Amino acid sequence: GERLPKHVKNISAEGISHVKLIDASPIGINVRSTVATYANVHDELRKIYARTADAKNRKYKAGDFSYNTGKLRCPVCDGTGQISLDVQFLPDVDVPCPECSGSRYGKEAWQICYENKQGERYSLPQLMEMDVNTALLATSDLKLVHQRLQVLKELGLGYLTLGEETPSLSGGEAQRIKLATELSRRSTGKTIYILDEPTTGLHFADVHKLTEILHRLSADG
């Protein structure tokens, strides 16, 4: 590891397995990083859609549902949901893709649907356009997906859409999504979490929600 500063002789952290910094720095550096991908929801949804009859009939695999590299991504914007316009004498302007209207997916992806226990059918592009609160209702019988979305809701992020670009999130939103991801992971030992001003800019109700989540982290070790 790195050499200790001269004024530090020794660091003892007996029983501590990990130290993790959860700050307000931006998540991701480009538009391909979304709330669903960072919260580990999108990969699970791709597997679920690959098991549907619609996908099997068309011989699509989980990888085909990736908007980054899959066969079902929009052929015009290559899954970014936007295109750049060359404006003379001015910086390029990014606008929603005219082919997929910003959904990132090609037309066939909209035809492959998952049917929940309520008999409602949704395509993956439809789910990605939903906010967390709405997606919770649509995926109530998908245990792992529902659990991860529920954590986002409990952190006061139910208004975010699954397809929202993470670089565009505020510092407070980014920090809470990082917390949600930690809560969704299986515990692998005692962990110290270092948070950088986690309540800055939060409403009192959201501060209360955050405090409850921190108590849960503490209880998990």
Which positions does each model-derived feature cover?
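Conserved phosphate-binding elements of NTP-dependent enzyme cores
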Residues: 1-221
